[in-house]
Each structure stands twice: as C-alpha cells, then as structure tokens.
Amino acid sequence: MSVTSSLKPSTANPAIHPELTVSLVASVESKAAQVSRLLTEACATLKHISFANSFSAEDMVLTDIILRKKLPISLFSLDTGRLPVETYDLMARVEAHYQTKLTLYFPQHESVERYVQTHGINAFYDSINLRKDCCSMRKVEPLQRALAGQDAWVTGMRAAQASTRSSLPVREFDESNKLEKFNPLSDWTEQEVWAYVHMHDVPYNQLHEQFYPSIGCAPCTRAIAMGEDIRAGRWWWEDPLNKECGLHVKK
C-alpha cells in the first residue's frame, strides 16, 4: 500500500518565528532557569544521566542548556537509517556549533534485513503492527542499548504536543526502562520553545521552515496545514489518539 497526503502546507508558519515580546522573553528566561536548576539537582543525586536528542526544536533547547551549563549529562541520538537529509545536515551543524561529537545508536542490521526481506521496505504503511515493529527495531531497541547502565534519562517532550502526552509530569519513573525519566519542558509552549531557539541562536532542522513541526523518519513524516495538530504529520494514516513510536509508551 502506498500512503500519500493530499493536504497542502500553509503559506505561513508564524509559530516558528514568534515576536520576542518582553513578557515572552521573561517567561522563557524563567523557565530556562527552572530547567537548569532541575537538571543540576538531578545530577547531584543521580550519577549517570543521559539525554536522548532527536533533534526536534525542543531537544535542541535542552541540548543548548546542557552544553551551555556544562552539565554532566551524556548526549546521544538514534539514527534509524531513514532520517530526512535535513536531520543529517542538522547533526553536522550541531557538532560544529557546539564543538562536540555526537554519539549515535543504530538499529541492528540483522533485524532490519529480516524485516525488509519478510515484509518489504515500506511495510510500515500496511498495518499498525508492522509500523510498530519498524519503530521497535529502529528506535526502541537502540534506545534500550543507549540507556543500559544509566540512572535516568532526559527527554524534550511537552504536554501540549499530543493527547497521548497531556498529563506529562516533569519527573516520572520509566517502567519500561526501569530508571528515572525527566521531561523538563513539560509545561513549555511551542512559542516559548521557538523564542528560546531565536534568543540563543540555537541551530534547528530546516524542515521546520517547510511546516514540519514534528520530524521523525522521512517516510513517516509530512508537512501539516494551518490549524492541524502539531503531530498530525507523524504516521498521519493512524488514529491520532494512539500515535507513538514506542519510546515513551507507558506499560
């Protein structure tokens, strides 16, 4: 089955270039300070903390805070093998901007080969189970390897991103991975995220300029139209109430 979108992106995307009003700047500075304090306190009590950077705008905010503050938090990313070229371009810009070397985790090639040979290269369009199997081998299993031996991990998730995240706490226990989980941007708005990006000259994915607010693997991500939910472009052929890749699904 081939899945394409008939929706046309809007001709303007004001959310990614908000007006930096006095009140907005003050709110961002206050919330950024709260994030810094939260992570500093976490580092004081937990020895091994990792941050999973997906290169979303939210994750770039956290990358900037962690590296600016020189917090002892290790950064890693998941390279699924099917990311957009713009995401790979951002990886290179992040390394140059922050003078750092990214740690990448890849899927096990045997699993990918077996999946493709059995089901086909784009089988994730054929059923929800096949899509979840693809996410599991390309994201969930590499994440488990990345988190091995860690006491906690940090994510850039926000409560306002989706109905599946509406009650997202700042700190929780991750039952799936058996460690603490911090969501420091839980109460941030999209406007505040982008305000921080522009206030601190944070590099970001150029697909955001083309109306992609949420970016995952290239075949499973599309642009959205004005007024759509910000995660409408992810697995757009599925029920929006249950769309997650498996990284943040609670048992």
Predicted regions and their residues:
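Nucleotide-activated chemistry modules centered on ATP-dependent adenylation/adenylyltransferase
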Residues: 2-251
